[in-house]
A protein has these predicted regions:
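Conserved alpha-helical "signature site"
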Residues: 1-127, 142-217, 255-265, 276-277
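General structural signal for secondary-structure boundaries
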Residues: 3, 39, 75-76, 140-142, ...
Length: 277
């Protein structure tokens, strides 16, 4: 990989907020620490390079993402942050519901799945946005519409950004192939595909009857679910962890709750299970 742990430690050591968050994470019951950790170097080595990198990315972009809204993608303020956090949490929890070993870089890749959206939203013209919207209305999905108008799309651009930043190759692969994991058949891109579909599922209106998560069946076969109830287990794990993260950031548990969860909170069954498509 292109990033050394000592470089990450150097970045964190001179930032009070990052140092606090790293020490807090390393000493938390969630990580499973058995003894108190008191310095950045010890905390980083204890957590490992990729968990530390994930924390660095989350802290560096968290406040910006919470205040960002993307009208071009019909996303309200905070939705980009929410989806990025849920994607990263989903990647972390995949090791609990799938038998295949999940690479440690995967949570970092999941956190950056929508990075390309931010770039496109800033630099494409209103006219191009209108053309994309027209193609969406005619039945294309977001990626097809962008490809027809721009000859690229936000997923491909996100992969290029990850490569440009010098992030580990597995992270770039996870970002770039989230939509088409069969092209590379890597565990990282298989998991980010699950994360991509998970965000799509949670953001869809539950009242519309769309209570299934549509995942490439080849991905499920490669990841090897540990039980037939993997979807329900994942739903519970991700929801509980997301609410804890909201608490850590001082946000209400119901803050910007995904539509599927909000619907379920009202006493309706929105978890119909997983579908392969």
């Amino acid at each position: 990989t292109n990033i050394d742990l000592s470089e990450i430690i150097s970045l964190i050591s001179y930032d009070q907020a990052l140092t606090y968050q790293l020490l807090k994470a390393a000493n938390s019951a969630y990580v499973g620490s058995v003894s108190r950790i008191t310095n950045v170097q010890e905390a980083a080595y204890f957590m490992g390079k990729f968990k530390t990198l994930n924390l660095l990315l989350a802290c560096a972009f968290g406040s910006k993402l919470r205040n960002t809204k993307l009208p071009a993608y019909e996303e309200v303020e905070g939705q980009l942050w929410r989806d990025s956090v849920i994607a990263s949490i989903t990647a972390e929890q995949c090791s609990k519901v799938f038998r295949l070993r999940i690479p440690p870089e995967t949570a970092c890749a999941a956190l950056l799945l929508n990075a390309g959206k931010v770039i496109l939203s800033r630099f494409i013209s209103d006219e191009m946005k209108r053309y994309i919207s027209e193609r969406r209305l005619s039945g294309r999905d977001q990626i097809q519409a962008e490809l027809e108008v721009l000859d690229t799309h936000y997923v491909e651009l996100g992969g290029i950004i990850a490569e440009h930043w010098g992030l580990p190759p597995e992270i770039a692969i996870g970002v770039k192939y989230q939509h088409d994991p069969d092209k590379v058949k890597k565990a990282t891109s298989d998991v980010t595909h699950v994360c991509y579909r998970w965000m799509e599922f949670l953001s869809s209106p539950a009242s519309s009857g769309n209570g299934e998560i549509k995942i490439n069946p080849n991905v499920i076969q490669r990841l090897q679910p540990s039980s037939k109830a993997w979807f329900e287990v994942m739903q519970t794990l991700v929801k509980e962890r997301y609410q804890k993260v909201c608490g850590d950031y001082g946000l209400p548990e119901q803050w910007l709750l995904p539509k599927q969860w909000a619907f379920d909170e009202r006493g309706n069954d929105s978890m119909n299970g997983a579908a392969c498509a």
